[in-house]
Design a protein with these regions (language model features):
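Proteins enriched for Cys/Gly/acidic motifs involved in redox and nucleic-acid/cofactor modification
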Residues: 1-203, 242, 257, 279-290, ...
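Radical SAM enzyme [4Fe-4S]-AdoMet core and its adjacent flexible, acidic
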Residues: 10, 203-225, 272, 335-366
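Conserved SAM/AdoMet-binding glycine-rich loop
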Residues: 75-79, 84, 89, 187-311, ...
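Short, hinge-like loop/turn segments at secondary-structure boundaries
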Residues: 93-94, 116-118, 211-213, 247-248, ...
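Short acidic/polar active-site loop segments enriched in Thr and Asp
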Residues: 97, 191, 227, 326, ...
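Conserved, mostly hydrophobic/aromatic
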Residues: 178, 195, 231, 259, ...
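Active-site proximal loops enriched in glycine and acidic residues that flank catalytic Cys/His/Asp
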Residues: 197, 233, 261-263, 299-303, ...
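Terminal RNA-binding accessory module
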Residues: 343-441
Length: 441
C-alpha cells in the first residue's frame, strides 16, 4: 500500500511518526508525498491547545476530501488529538476509518491490514505505560539532525496543561536504548542530536534516580560522529548545579537551553502549580549565564492566565525587560478541557489575552533587535541546513538556533556549502530573527 503522512505538532510527535513509518515500511508498504496517490493517509495530530486542535481537524478534513476521487482511500488519525478527542472525531468526522491512540502506535501495521481486510471505524488504545519509546525508525528530519526522545509523559501536573492526561505519567526510556539509538543516528550521518521529552530534566525520576539526565549526557557526549547535543524543554526547577556541571564538562552539549518558565509572578506561578518563584527563576538564569558564558536562553510565557491582574501582567513585562531572554515566545492562555485552570474563576476575555501576549512580544522584539545587531562583525560557527532556492542564500544555524523554532544565519557564498557541514561565517547584517554573512576567509 502507498502511505502518505501529514505530520503536525512538536518534535516528540515527529519521532512517533518516524517510528510508525518504519513499522509500515518494514511491513512492505511504501510512502508517497502526494496525498492524491495514497491508499492510506496517516494524519499524526497535535491536540495540545485549541489552535492545534483546529489545525488538526482541518488537516483531517483535507485528507478525507481525497475519498471523493478514491473511495477506497483509508484515513487514519493518530497522535495527541486521537488520544484526547477520540469520540469527537468518530462522531463528527465519520469518514475517518481508524483512530489510533498514542500508546498503540506500534500496532499501526495491524490497523492498516485490518482496514484492507474489510473492517472499518477501528480504534486502538493501549495502556499509557506501553507507549513506544523510539527504537528503529526513519529519520523524518534533514539527515544531519535528529530528535532523540528520552521519555514519555509528565508528572509536573501544571494546572494549564493537558499533556499528562494525553501522554500519561513520566516513563523514562532505558538509558542504554537511548545511547544505542544515538549511535545509530550518528552512523546515519546525524551531526546534531536534539534531546526531547515533555521534561528531559526529570529523566530517571520514575526509576527513583533524579538527575539521570546528567549521566545520559555523559554517555551521549562519547558517541562518535555527533558534533552538537541540544537540550529542549528543560524545567527551571530541575536546573541543579549537577546539571550545569554536566553541560559544562561535555563539550558536545551546546550552550543553549530552552527553559519554559511560563510566568514570573509568584501568585500566578503558584496558581499554575509551578514549583519556582520569581527569585528562584532569577537565580537559575543568573547561574546559567555565569557558569556557561554565552549561553543562549529560550523561554515560553503565558499571558492572560485566569486571575492575572494588570499589576501581575506588568510584573511579567518588567521581568522580560530585566532578564532579556535571547529567544522568547508568548502565547495567550488557552483554557483546555480537563485541566484545573479551565475551571478557575477569573477567566480573562480573549481580546485582553491576545493584547497582553502581543505586548510581551513587542517588548521582546526590541530586545531581539538589539541582541541581533550586536552580532554584526562577529565570526560565528554554523551548521548548514541547505539552500533557499528563491534567494540563493545558504541557511545555516549557530549553537544558539534550534531548528524550526529559531532563526537562521543566511550565508552568501560563491562556493557551494553542503548540508551537515560546519563553517565559520562573518556576520555583516542582521534583522529581527536572522543574521546575514559570508564564509570567513
Amino acid at each position: 500500500m502507498k502511505i502518505a503522512c501529514i505530520s503536525l505538532g512538536c518534535p516528540k510527535n515527529q519521532v512517533d511518526l518516524d517510528v510508525m513509518v518504519h513499522i509500515l515500511l518494514s511491513a512492505g508498504h511504501e510512502t508517497v508525498a502526494d496525498l492524491a496517490e495514497a491508499d492510506v493517509i496517516l494524519v499524526n495530530t497535535c491536540g495540545f491547545i485549541e489552535s492545534a486542535k483546529t489545525e488538526a481537524i482541518e488537516n483531517i478534513l483535507e485528507a478525507c476530501s481525497y475519498k471523493q476521487q478514491n473511495p477506497e482511500l483509508k484515513v487514519i488519525v493518530t497522535g495527541c488529538l486521537a488520544e484526547r478527542s477520540r469520540s469527537q472525531i468518530e462522531e463528527e468526522i465519520p469518514e475517518v476509518d481508524a483512530v489510533v491512540g498514542c500508546a498503540s502506535n506500534k500496532a499501526i501495521d495491524t490497523i492498516v491490514a485490518r482496514l484492507f481486510h474489510g473492517e472499518d471505524h477501528l480504534e486502538s488504545y493501549g495502556a499509557k505505560k506501553d507507549f513506544p519509546l523510539g527504537g528503529k525508525r526513519v529519520i523524518g528530519t534533514p539527515a544531519h539532525y535528529a530528535y532523540l526522545k528520552i521519555a514519555e509523559g509528565c508528572n509536573n501536573r501544571c494546572h494549564y496543561c493537558a499533556i499528562p492526561g494525553i501522554r500519561g505519567p513520566l516513563h523514562s526510556r532505558d538509558m542504554a536504548d537511548c545511547v544505542a539509538e544515538a549511535r545509530w543516528l550518528a552512523g546515519e550521518g546525524v551531526k546534531e542530536l536534539i534531546v526531547v521529552a515533555q521534561d528531559p530534566t526529570a529523566y530517571g525520576e520514575d526509576w527513583g534516580k533524579p538527575g539521570s539526565i546528567c549521566e545520559l549526557l555523559d554517555k551521549l557526549n562519547k558517541v562518535p560522529g555527533l558534533e552538537w547535543i541540544r537540550i529542549m524543554y528543560a524545567y527551571p526547577e530541575r536546573i541543579t548545579d549537577e546539571f550545569i556541571a554536566a553541560m559544562k564538562r561535555n563539550e558536545k552539549v551546546v550552550p543553549y537551553l530552552d527553559l519554559p518558565i511560563q510566568h514570573c509572578n509568584d501568585t500566578i506561578l503558584k496558581n499554575m502549580n509551578r514549583r519556582s518563584n520569581r527569585a528562584e527563576l532569577l537565580e537559575v538564569i543568573g547561574k546559567l549565564r555565569r557558569e556557561i558564558p554565552g549561553i543562549t536562553l529560550r523561554t515560553t510565557l503565558i499571558a492572560g492566565f485566569p486571575g492575572e491582574t494588570e499589576e501581575q501582567f506588568e510584573d511579567l513585562c518588567n521581568f522580560v525587560k530585566e532578564v532579556k531572554f535571547d529567544r522568547l515566545g508568548c502565547f495567550a492562555y488557552s483554557a483546555e478541557e480537563n485541566t484545573v485552570a479551565a475551571k478557575m474563576d477569573g477567566q480573562i476575555d480573549q481580546e485582553t489575552k491576545d493584547k497582553r501576549a502581543e505586548l510581551v512580544m513587542q517588548i521582546q522584539t526590541g530586545i531581539m533587535a538589539q541582541k541581533q545587531a550586536e552580532k554584526v562583525g562577529q565570526t560565528v560557527h554554523v551548521l548548514c541546513d541547505g539552500i533557499d532556492e528563491e534567494s540563493g542564500l545558504y541557511l545555516c544555524r549557530t549553537t544558539g538556533d534550534a531548528p524550526e523554532v529559531d532563526g537562521n544565519v543566511c550565508v552568501s557564498s560563491e562556493e557551494p556549502l553542503y548540508p551537515g557541514q560546519f563553517y565559520d561565517v562573518l556576520v555583516d547584517d542582521s534583522d529581527l530573527y536572522d543574521l546575514y554573512g559570508t564564509v570567513a576567509k
